[in-house]
Design a protein with these regions (language model features):
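Surface-exposed, polar/charged interaction patches used for macromolecular assembly or partner binding
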Residues: 1-360
Length: 360
């Protein structure tokens, strides 16, 4: 069983007080006081005398008080609370994408107005939808990536099951096969619509009128439907270490968003663990390239002659794991989560391991 030190290491140059500014994130704030931002819950002392004591707002004055505890003196609190990660850098992954365990049984588009091949805002889609009601709001989505657990110790290339041009935001992701179980199906939103007429005796399809679509995507037959969520995400969370239930789970990077096949700070990644494994928003992982197993090719010479040293091909050597970065989860699904790379020393690639943030 792995054990990690939990002693809180306060930054030597930390401020005695800090006035929270608009644009700060909880990771930024924690880093001003701590060498390890994921230990913020260890020093944060919520004020029980104020509403929503765990939220921090621009204008609040944070102080490192007695026994290395951070307390907050509320400011005017006229703006939105500070978020865990910058909204602008993760917004497409909050509003456009979701992951489901299966796409079987989802309602779907069977046809379009005037027998079109594509439909956009203001036009009509005909959908197979049980128990449809006029006025219901639905998101039209398209399956893009099918996630599966990567092979161990493998740097994977940008292959995978994807519908080209369908809203997939990843530049590299793991390609599943029949030997590795599917973790989930990613759905990209292509439009929104409202049910105006339901199926009846003379028709088997309900009518969905599409909203004006600012993203320019077009709906087509075969697209699926999911309910519109009133609040699909929450960005008010603290960085923290993984729950005990995550220990021992083989968590790996499934996808990266950088322009090539690797991601650096402020790039989004997908990892192979979610709510079912105890991962929640704010969970921090360290990301590692597993040490390669290389052939031990050199034979030590039995004499001083250099040409006696030859490649033997015998034996293999395991190289050390290599640290790449830290990432913080900002959205979770059953078996997949999205995380933002917060800091690192080298690019993150698909297949890298996600470990406890204090792993060495």
């Amino acid at each position: 069983v792995a054990a990690y030190a939990t002693a809180v290491e306060v930054n030597g140059g930390h401020p005695d007080t800090y006035v929270v500014r608009k644009g700060d994130t909880l990771w930024d704030i924690a880093g001003k006081f701590l060498q390890k931002p994921w230990l913020w819950p260890e020093i944060w002392q919520a004020n029980p005398q104020i509403a929503n004591p765990h939220l921090i707002y621009p204008g609040d004055v944070l102080s490192l008080a007695y026994l290395d505890r951070v307390t907050a003196k509320p400011g005017p609190r006229q703006e939105a609370p500070v978020t865990g990660v910058p909204l602008a850098q993760v917004e497409p992954f909050l509003k456009q994408l979701s992951v489901v365990d299966s796409i079987e049984g989802l309602p779907y588009v069977v046809g379009l107005e005037d027998n079109r091949l594509r439909a956009t805002g203001g036009q009509t889609a005909y959908v197979r939808l049980a128990d449809a009601q006029p006025g219901q709001r639905w998101a039209v989505v398209r399956p893009t990536v099918r996630y599966a657990q990567p092979k161990p110790t493998e740097d994977l290339t940008a292959n995978g099951d994807v519908t080209p041009g369908s809203g997939n935001l990843w530049k590299a992701f793991n390609a599943p096969n029949h030997r590795r179980g599917v973790l989930g199906y990613e759905l990209a939103q292509v439009g929104l619509g409202t049910i105006t007429q339901v199926a009846g005796e003379k028709t088997e399809a309900s009518t969905l009128v599409l909203d004006s679509n600012a993203n320019g995507r077009e709906v087509r037959a075969g697209d699926r439907l999911v309910p519109v969520e009133a609040q699909p995400y929450d960005l008010q969370f603290f960085p923290h270490v993984p729950a005990a239930s995550v220990e021992g789970v083989d968590v790996r990077v499934l996808a990266v968003t950088d322009m090539f096949d690797a991601g650096g700070p402020r790039d989004v990644i997908a990892i192979s663990a979610g709510k079912a494994q105890g991962v929640d928003n704010g969970t921090v992982f360290s990301l590692w390239r597993q040490g390669s197993h290389v052939a031990h090719r050199m034979k030590y010479p039995t004499s001083s002659r250099m040409d006696d040293s030859r490649s033997t091909g015998a034996g293999r050597v395991t190289l050390p794991d290599e640290y790449a970065a830290h990432a913080m989860v900002f959205r979770t699904f059953d078996n997949v989560s999205y995380a933002l790379v917060m800091q690192g020393v080298k690019p993150v690639k698909v297949g890298y391991s996600a470990l406890h943030p204090d792993a060495k």
